[in-house]
Amino acid sequence: YKSLEDLIKLGFDRVLTSGQEATVPEGADLLEELVQIAGDRIIVMPGCGITERNFPKLRDKIKAKEYHIYLPYETMSKMKFHPGHIYMGGLLRQSEFTITHTSSSRVSDVMGTL
């Protein structure tokens, strides 16, 4: 817990973390401990892999004050030319022809569970 204490001593007011795991569901045990240890000295903000489905369970276990949740939807871009063999976004070959937005209705649904 030294890193958490170091952040507090340095004056940080918030830390975004998945609990030293790839996602919050995997790091939930450590996140629960960090939130308890931090108390009101720093906000531990769990983030990565939180969905509408797992949020209630994670919220009840971790008991953080804030959460970072990605709730997207996509729309088609207005691009006319779609060369399917050229990828500008790197090796993962993500769509070049969509725009990702935050879904306000999904956010409202999650907020309604608080």
Regions found by a protein language model. Give the residues of each.
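Glycine-rich phosphate-binding active-site loops on the catalytic face of alpha/beta enzymes
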Residues: 12-27, 50, 62-84, 91
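Short N-terminal micro-motifs specific to bacterial/archaeal maturation
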Residues: 22, 46-49, 98-101
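Catalytic cores of alpha/beta
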Residues: 1-10, 31-36, 44-46, 50-69
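C-terminal helical cap(s) of enzyme catalytic domains, especially alpha/beta-barrels
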Residues: 27-37, 57-62, 76-114
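A general secondary-structure boundary signal
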Residues: 13, 43-45, 109
